[in-house]
Amino acid sequence: MDFIKSAASFIAKAGSQFPYDLNEKIPLSSNSVWTLQTGSIRESAQPCSVFSISLSTHPEWAELADRACETMKTLRHPCIIKYLSTYKSSTHLYIATETVRPVTTELNELSAEIKTYGLWRVSAALSFLNDKNIVHGNLQMSSVYLNSADEWIIGDFFLAGDSPQFIKDNHDKILNWSRLVPFEIQSSTLNSASFIYLDSYELGKFISHLYNGTPGDLSQRGNIPANIFVSAKKLLNVEGKQKLLASEFLKLGERPGGFFRTHLITLYELLSEVRINEEEDRVKLKQLLSSKLEVIPKNYIQKVVLNILFLLLSIDTHSDVVELLFKCAQIVKGRPDIEKDFGVPLLSLLKQQSVPIRGLLLSGIINNPDVLPKNIYEDTSFSVFANLVRSNSPTLKEHAIVVFSIIAPKLSKKTLNNELLRSLAVVQNDQHPTLRTNSTICLGKIAEYLDASVRKPVLAAALSRSLKDPFVPAREAALKVLLSVQNYFDTKDVAIKLFPSVVPLLIDENEGIRRTAEDVTDQFLSRIKNFNLGEKENVSAPAKFNGSFWSKFIHSSSASPSPSIDMKKESLELKNDTTEIKEKKNSKSRVVGNTENSKDEFNNPLFETEEQIDESWMENWNDEEETENNVEESWGL
């Protein structure tokens, strides 16, 4: 028993020292000695890939594996696999790197344009190594990987170094030396100056494999692009003036009009170098992104493009940046880590940036509600939106109200029935009439999601207050909402709480309000009559309101930019006749609207706006009125 306890203790101790949590295995080529697994570093929880090799099973690979590890430690380049850490036991060597997967498993699915981009990165990696007098010596398709952003990177540095003899002595362990390397290199005097062409030769074989599926000798072009084929053949030359180094091949491709001067590679260069300070670069970047989004890998969009666009918003406040941002979000919505890559920076910008940028972001949310990740709906995130309705900007308030109606169904009950309603109550007391109107419309939209214990008192208090609003559309909205939510109330509540608030509107100065109030009172009286006749009540959630009233919020003429909102893709028709509003301050008459001349009165400039309406009514309520309306102002919350 003591022995078993000791063994268990030893295993537990060894396990606690192991620095990685290992997950699923990633298939590699049949000739690979590596085992590749996804995982994470225990200490930091950083996601990673873990390459491991059994030193007991493959003792002949011990020196090569150590060499690969040491080389990776010293190299830092965007096109070379990023080393994180190493762990070595008596039987295994483990190397943790950035998250990668082999390109071989996806090669057949890649377009020629993406393959050319990959060739550009592989050539850049070899050029970097050769400039440092390092020969990779093992370039083949199985030594090329894709990172989490789908960027092509090279690894497998078993032979890398400046020792031609070491490469020749050990190359057969990886691939047959005589089959891969031309006779001239095999028989020539071994020196670094000539041996560096080994990488060029392997690059030529790689190009054949990349486009044609097998590492041939380039005697036939096959699917290799014609402008690449001519230069690629020179990579296989060993003697004479026609031979090319990998760095020379790269320069040929990158010169003006070269085979690496594609729009996609230019876009990648702009993104990788974060060249956004110059207006010319920003315009070029936006144009290329707009035209190439469909061919850019989704991982790259999520890990790189989104980040650059969020950064770009700090400099470029044009709406086309936000449009691109949400186009990208549409492409990668629902993917793993989207909360971190899109949700977190979005919330951060909504907290910190200027009013125009926050307005544009809110407009993007309104027009693309399906892209929002889960963390947008968390209780801790709602404070970002709640603070917007307490800002000094009518634009932000207007947008925030619409966002409330979008996110309400997915909020927790606690946030919905408390924080969101408190925020709407604040807006209903706002000095801007369109905002007060929109708060009522929003309340009607979210009523079905509220708890029953909260819904009735909130609706009664809020609508009673809105029915007294001097702004015609506000009263119209309150009547429409009241009509649509009446089934939440039993007949006694209708008679006692709702009916008395509607009756004064039967003699309203606005003919449209009077007509709507008549419709409401007729329905209420019909319910009361049926109740008195003893008919059974059916108090339940109201049927979905199909009228055009629900399709849009109204807009403030002073708020710019106004959100482009079409919640149900319907036209909005609020039927108001020409109306005169008598003001307490200057007793001037104003035309409110005429349905004969407008099909969308909520957006029509004939509607009263903040600049047109006299707000002195808010200051001139007497103490008695204030006392009576305390409950209405706070909605009883």
UniProtKB/Swiss-Prot annotation:
Keywords: Golgi apparatus. Residues 1-296 form the Protein kinase domain. Residues 608-631 have a biased composition (Acidic residues). GO terms for molecular function: ATP binding; protein kinase activity. Its main location: Golgi. InterPro entries: ARM-like, ARM-type_fold, CIK-Related_Protein, Kinase-like_dom_sf, Prot_kinase_dom, Ser-Thr/Tyr_kinase_cat_dom. Gene3D superfamilies: Leucine-rich Repeat Variant (1.25.10.10), Phosphorylase Kinase, domain 1 (3.30.200.20), Transferase(Phosphotransferase) domain 1 (1.10.510.10). GO terms for biological process: tRNA export from nucleus. HEAT repeats lie at residues 414-450. The protein kinase domain is predicted to be catalytically inactive. This is Protein kinase domain-containing protein ppk3. It comes from Schizosaccharomyces pombe (strain 972 / ATCC 24843).
